[in-house]
């Protein structure tokens, strides 16, 4: 028996699951994967969501086929009656659920549920406010190049439960994990944990910064002396305050990957973090350097879209935080015309005043959050504002000079005008490739 929360004991062993009734909250890909895995383990399942419209046809067909109990509607105590365990999908805030069920009910993440069903796979888990997808992708590429079989999943696309259900097994599982996924992890213990950085983010979901940091550090809280934690310099105090037991290594750019095609010092640091993890599992330095040299920058992450009339257009739509904006600005020596704006998530924009003054010639704002940027930088740099990204791109393209960079680095979420950062980045690329052709 293992204690996972609230001083209560739940066994996660396979043969114990028929004893439990589990509420799976949320019907996206993570919720569906958790439900399918629980069904295979013999648990009784109740699917909970606010509305039937959220459920895909595939999932609804599966629910009917398996006769799982379903409850739709606003969250209420009745949804959690007779429930032993709640598995919330990432993005479902716990503070919206907990008022509706007793403290004796255990909260478990889909990731932890699946992790406990693994066999002998080594696990590399990566989190951080910025950089985690690049590090996870680099880890996977290095391992594959070394001839080591890999599953890559978590926040990067495929829930771990889907891997557990498939018959093909691998040597190493690489997981990118968000604070949403980690917050409900109590036992999770990867062999290697990487935390790229922690800066203000998701305070619309977490109650405060302390809760956000605590969620992130769940990635290494349960590690012991035989495990490895790879952390960014500046996180030394957290090792003591959270009483981390793992071997701790702090990574930085050591110049090992100077031939990388990735823009920015932060990406060279990401390569170092990936290399430290993979070296632990037998990847040679030669292989690591080969991978980093040929590694293509990921979409929406300092993605060079087009060189038009001597102006380089760069898409960093994934950069939704103040620290991501800092890293993007530090990646260029050329003068920058900065595109920023959206739904502001918090952070100290005034901390960027020195680099804005040094590196940026004009700031082109679009969408919401105009006042945050104007208050922070309005006295040191020209700022324009347009309602849409397309209008802002057109304006800056008329103002740009040969040899300059027009950089989309919003420092905000996209939810004021777009479904997500991907839709925003794709719209930017459409504008650069299609609209500017007509505009020129």
Swiss-Prot record:
E.C. numbers: 6.3.2.9
- Positions binding ATP in this chain are 128-134
Q: Where in the cell is it found?
A: Cytoplasm
GO cellular component terms, alphabetically, are: cytoplasm
Q: By its UniProt entry, which InterPro entries does this protein fall under?
A: FAD-bd (IPR002938), Mur-like_cat_sf (IPR036565), Mur_ligase_C (IPR004101), Mur_ligase_C_dom_sf (IPR036615), Mur_ligase_cen (IPR013221), MurD (IPR005762)
- Report the main location listed first in the record: cytoplasm
User: Gene3D superfamilies, alphabetically?
Assistant: Mur ligase, C-terminal domain (3.90.190.20), Mur-like, catalytic domain (3.40.1190.10), NAD(P)-binding Rossmann-like Domain (3.40.50.720)
Record Pfam families? FAD_binding_3, Mur_ligase_C, Mur_ligase_M, MurD-like_N
Q: In which pathway does it act?
A: Cell wall biogenesis; peptidoglycan biosynthesis
The protein's GO terms of the molecular function aspect are: ATP binding; FAD binding; UDP-N-acetylmuramoylalanine-D-glutamate ligase activity
Transmembrane region positions? Answer: none
Keywords annotated in UniProt: ATP-binding, Cell cycle, Cell division, Cell shape, Cell wall biogenesis/degradation, Cytoplasm, Ligase, Nucleotide-binding, Peptidoglycan synthesis
Q: What family does the database annotate?
A: Belongs to the MurCDEF family.
Q: NCBIfam families, per this entry?
A: murD (TIGR01087)
Give the protein's function: Cell wall formation. Catalyzes the addition of glutamate to the nucleotide precursor UDP-N-acetylmuramoyl-L-alanine (UMA).
The entry's protein name is UDP-N-acetylmuramoylalanine--D-glutamate ligase
Q: Which organism is it from?
A: Lawsonia intracellularis (strain PHE/MN1-00)
| Name of the encoding gene | murD
